[in-house]
């Protein structure tokens, strides 16, 4: 069972706030709600807890300021709304936090800032320096320059990447959803609320719902994706409603929320970065023998490789997919896609004869790999796989 610790037991908390909580479509910024949230944050900081905020709302706030019509926005309209909204959003956070003599620092990230190793380290250093001097980083995706091809797509996953980047031990996702149900409760009156989730299994993933509101891009699907990123890196996660004022106090006082347990296996900073990669360059599909070997902490050898998909270069991050079609690990691949296909299913001793050079024995070395799913015994895996056939 997942341990529900008081928030004061955590040392570094990332809080993601959805657009609909901060911005009213007609009235604009919900200042009273923001002031109450900042008072909650001040309470955590008074207990010595580092707090980071991933704040949605720039596009929604800019849309309100510009009085744009309802409905989907074109890319250039969204970017214009973000340009206006980012200024207003940063000002609002700064003013509300200053009531408790807390300084806010704005950070706008693009996908490359967490997916490219050098930029990742630089962004992490900047955030850590802000925390060191007692400021609260207010983080958002830089929607003025991001396009569909180079964006996170939602702030749930961005928040998870920030949590893993900064070594946070708790991620709180606040939105208009109070947690995870076995089915959408507005569609199924028999839907059961899940208070604790010890592992994100295929069954849990199947419970994730779909689309979001006009003011936001997130949904339960993105929250489960965020949970996989965070918990794999040893960070617990909470999904809770932010509709009430002082939602952090409400969580501490027992308000309904879903708690996700972190992985029991600590990972290095480098493996944390690998695990959280949002866009693997390709996929390596492996057999049952390889799954068993990886579960035992061994490297992935070419012999266990059934097929290769995608275009990638040596050193890129790839997803490792088991026979049931589920991702089980991620790692830095030792070969480019073309050579990986040529040696798939072959013994390591044959590599030089096939490729004409002596490459690494492992397709993905265990030091460059992190498990993203728990590997059960083979008999149990086969039984579960049959239920999805």
Curated annotation (Swiss-Prot):
Domain PUA, by residue range, is 281-358
Q: Where in the cell is it found?
A: Cytoplasm
**Mind listing the GO molecular function terms for this protein?**
ATP binding; glutamate 5-kinase activity; RNA binding
Under SUPFAM superfamilies, the record lists:
Carbamate kinase-like (SSF53633), PUA domain-like (SSF88697)
Known SMART domains for this protein?
A: PUA
**What pathway does this protein act in?**
Amino-acid biosynthesis; L-proline biosynthesis; L-glutamate 5-semialdehyde from L-glutamate: step 1/2
Name of the protein described by the UniProt record: Glutamate 5-kinase
Q: Which reaction does it catalyse?
A: L-glutamate + ATP = L-glutamyl 5-phosphate + ADP
Q: List the disulfide bonds.
A: none
Q: What class of enzyme is it?
A: transferase
What is the protein's major site of localization?
Answer: cytoplasm
Function (record text): Catalyzes the transfer of a phosphate group to glutamate to form L-glutamate 5-phosphate.
Q: What is its EC number?
A: 2.7.2.11
Family named by the database record: Belongs to the glutamate 5-kinase family.
Do you know which CDD domains this protein is assigned to?
Answer: AAK_G5K_ProB, PUA_G5K
> Would you kindly state one Gene Ontology biological process term found in this protein's UniProt entry?
L-proline biosynthetic process
Q: Which PANTHER family would you find in this protein's record?
A: GLUTAMATE 5-KINASE, ISOPENTENYL PHOSPHATE KINASE
Q: Which residues bind ATP?
A: 16, 175-176
Per the record, its GO cellular-component terms are: cytosol
């Amino acid at each position: 069972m997942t341990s529900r610790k008081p928030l004061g037991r955590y040392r570094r908390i990332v809080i993601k706030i959805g657009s609909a909580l901060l911005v009213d479509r007609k009235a604009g910024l919900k200042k009273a709600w923001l002031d109450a949230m900042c008072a909650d944050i001040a309470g955590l900081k008074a207990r010595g807890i580092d707090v980071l905020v991933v704040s949605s709302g720039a596009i929604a706030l800019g849309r309100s300021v510009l009085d744009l019509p309802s409905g989907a926005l074109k890319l250039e309209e969204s970017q214009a709304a973000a340009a206006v909204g980012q200024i207003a959003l940063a000002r609002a956070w700064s003013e509300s936090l200053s009531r408790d003599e807390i300084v806010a620092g704005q950070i706008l990230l693009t996908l490359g800032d967490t997916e490219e190793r050098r930029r990742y380290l630089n962004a992490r250093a900047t955030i850590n320096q802000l925390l060191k001097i007692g400021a609260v980083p207010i983080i958002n995706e830089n929607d003025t320059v991001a396009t569909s091809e180079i964006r996170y797509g939602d702030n749930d996953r961005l928040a998870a990447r920030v949590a893993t980047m900064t070594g946070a031990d708790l991620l709180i996702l606040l939105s208009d959803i109070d947690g995870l149900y076995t089915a959408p409760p507005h569609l199924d009156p028999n839907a059961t609320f899940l208070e604790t989730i010890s592992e994100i299994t295929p069954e849990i993933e199947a419970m994730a719902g779909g689309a979001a509101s006009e003011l936001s891009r997130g949904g339960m699907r993105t929250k489960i994706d965020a949970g996989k990123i965070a918990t794999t890196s040893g960070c617990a996660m909470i999904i809770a409603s932010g509709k009430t004022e002082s939602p952090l106090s409400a969580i501490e006082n027992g308000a309904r929320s879903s708690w996700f347990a972190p992985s029991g296996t600590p990972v290095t900073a480098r493996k944390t970065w690998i695990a959280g990669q949002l866009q693997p360059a390709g996929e390596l599909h492996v057999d049952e023998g390889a799954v068993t070997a990886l579960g035992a902490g061994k490297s992935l050898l070419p012999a266990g490789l059934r097929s290769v998909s995608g275009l990638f270069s040596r050193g890129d991050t790839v997803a490792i997919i088991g026979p049931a079609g589920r991702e089980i690990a991620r790692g830095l691949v030792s070969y480019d896609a073309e050579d990986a296909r040529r040696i798939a299913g072959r013994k390591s001793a044959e590599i030089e004869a096939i490729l004409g050079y002596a490459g690494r024995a492992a397709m993905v070395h265990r030091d460059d790999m992190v498990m993203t799913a728990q590997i059960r015994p083979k008999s149990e895996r086969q039984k579960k796989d049959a239920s999805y056939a």
